């Protein structure tokens, strides 16, 4: 009997190295060499003035981790660092990662090691000897049975059900780690985008107010001319309409600025009413945000290893693969070994006198008929893997699209800024000439103000175009996955 038990146990130990189900392999990266059909331009168009330099795209193995420092603004760096430290979104992601790690630690201990428990109990019993056919001996009085023992049990993972389940839990740890990296990337990107938008809105409000002032002066002149019979009433009404329309653009701009401040406050982990970061916000202008001249650009084949959201989707695919292994292993036998040793006495003071009971048990369970449950669960796990793979492919395709969109946007933004800058310079030159001619009586005050109004309008358009280049550069960095990725959990 002992030799048979040893044979069974030895066989179980040998089989414990067998793991059924698919072994996970990361999907192949995208095969395309470029992000768009037209390819990446050698350089974008250039314009004179702030933010007008040409951008070149430099092939690189990865994107700088702290990519926001490429904008050369100490105030922006402080805001991003503060958000990465205090954002509630990141606090939640960190807590979820800790939760996943502790769940893995708990499952690993239960799956890899025997469970050992100590037991101490007292049971009040009474024996009826007559029920055993013993009638000549009187029944003993009731007594208390004291038990102190240690029990050990272990499930031999013959076909890898526990190992696959542990693999799935470890993949969940990877998922939460990449989700944290993705959240960091999103928070940093949102701070940069909001900072650019805030700087642009402040500049737009300033220029628009100057436009209102210029149009108001024009209206005063036209009303004086109307009184003198120099212009028609319809011309004055047209000027009043233009002034009202320009004034009407100020409240929405002020609302957008306030909402941007509120968004930044939440990203920084403070209430919208807080003025904690006002010095940094006041230091942000479009001219202090420098456009990166050289932008690191990774290959599409590297994108799948650089983007945290793609790595998170890969971790979920890994988890689905491991769950197929769990469902497959559940179709096979399971062996359990258990034993205990201890003492059982009728007087509690005798419990320490020595060991007098032990047991050793062996169990084998082979599923035979479960109404199709186990096979259905295996098919369900395989379908879940198919869904996870489709989600992974969709994530990769969306990432490629985001990079392609950002590249095309930057190319168009540069061309737009070039045109807007040329228009602004020409309008400013006209205003300068008009001012000189006005000084010698060559043009009227109305004409001078009109050329100044045109210069302000073109400056407003240039401001928007300059902000678009900064915002889309940040979008490209974010699309390329500029974030510190965690090392894959060792297996």
Features from the language model and the residues they span:
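Terminal intrinsically disordered/low-complexity segments used for targeting and assembly
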Residues: 2-85, 131-135, 146, 170, ...
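Short flexible linkers and secondary-structure junctions
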Residues: 19-190, 334-339, 355-359, 368-378
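Sec/SRP-type N-terminal targeting helices
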Residues: 91-92, 156-184, 234, 238, ...
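Heptad-repeat amphipathic alpha-helical coiled-coil interaction surface used
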Residues: 97-99, 104, 122, 166, ...
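Hydrophobic stripe of amphipathic alpha-helices that form coiled-coil interfaces
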Residues: 100, 107, 114, 176, ...
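Periplasmic alpha-helical coiled-coil/stalk elements that build and connect Gram-negative outer-membrane
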Residues: 162, 178-299, 409, 413, ...
